[in-house]
From Swiss-Prot:
Its EC number is 3.1.1.1. This is Probable carboxylesterase clz11. Pfam families: Abhydrolase_3. It comes from the Eukaryota. Probable carboxylesterase; part of the gene cluster that mediates the biosynthesis of squalestatin S1 (SQS1, also known as zaragozic acid A), a heavily oxidized fungal polyketide that offers potent cholesterol lowering activity by targeting squalene synthase (SS). SQS1 is composed of a 2,8-dioxobicyclic[3.2.1]octane-3,4,5-tricarboxyclic acid core that is connected to two lipophilic polyketide arms. The active site is at S77. Pathway: Secondary metabolite biosynthesis. GO terms for molecular function: carboxylesterase activity. It comes from Cochliobolus lunatus. Belongs to the 'GDXG' lipolytic enzyme family.
Length: 218
């Protein structure tokens, strides 16, 4: 699952694996969409995967046929969060393994919610007043539009502003939705498939406090 904090990237960002079929969902991105919109799109993907992919592969006589009993769900950044949530929301799909790379799994941390000037990947965002202006201007200009991909270089300044101003999670939660609450989902389901979490200790974009391993998983 493509990620980049639900803001940039697209479904073509994954390389190949031998002896595997790679299926990557395309979903709407922030800030044009909300977290609820993104989850609706991912829900539609899983429904399509289980109802349409097998017949599609058969009708086109693919050399490799999908085996939906052996699903490996991999995602980076926002996509890693979606991979974990997919297993929590759909235990009936029997996802076998999850790989989550530098994903924000726990949102209620100062790193994502409290505005503060900080260096991100060696770059200082614009000053707070200017950053807020850039965010509001982009949201106003893009109102009503739909975006499912974005060039990281084109969106980089906006991402810096959103991170510095602590606005990313508030944009995700414009439409309240229990599907966004990782701890709540895990308490409901009670377990996850085997999970490989990868996160850098010095990650300046999504700090390790967002990974929630000790808060939620253990």
């Amino acid at each position: 699952m493509a990620g980049d904090l639900w803001l940039v990237g697209d479904c073509t960002n994954h390389g190949g694996l031998s002896d595997a079929i790679i299926v990557s969902p395309d979903y709407r991105l922030l800030p044009e969409a909300t977290g609820a919109d993104i989850f609706d799109d991912v829900e539609a993907f899983w429904n399509w995967l289980h109802t349409s992919l097998p017949s599609l592969a058969q009708s086109y006589s693919w050399q490799a046929q999908p085996d939906l009993t052996r699903i490996l769900c991999v995602g980076q950044s926002g996509g890693g969060s979606m991979a974990v949530h997919s297993a929590l929301l759909h235990p009936e799909y029997s996802i076998k393994v999850i790989v989550s790379l530098y994903a924000p799994l726990y949102h209620n941390v100062p790193n994502l919610t409290v505005p503060r000037p900080r260096r991100i990947l060696g770059t200082m965002p614009p000053p707070p007043r200017k950053a807020e202006g850039l965010i509001r201007s982009y949201i106003k200009q893009s109102k009503g539009s739909v975006r499912t991909g974005g060039n990281p270089f084109d969106m980089w300044e906006l991402l810096l502003c959103l991170l510095q101003q602590g606005r990313l999670i508030s944009l995700m939660n414009i439409k309240p939705d229990s599907r966004l609450d990782t701890p709540f989902l895990l308490r409901q389901v009670g377990k996850l498939p085997p999970l490989w979490l990868i996160h850098g200790e010095d990650d300046s974009v999504v700090g390790p406090s967002t990974i929630c391993v000790h808060r939620v998983i253990f």
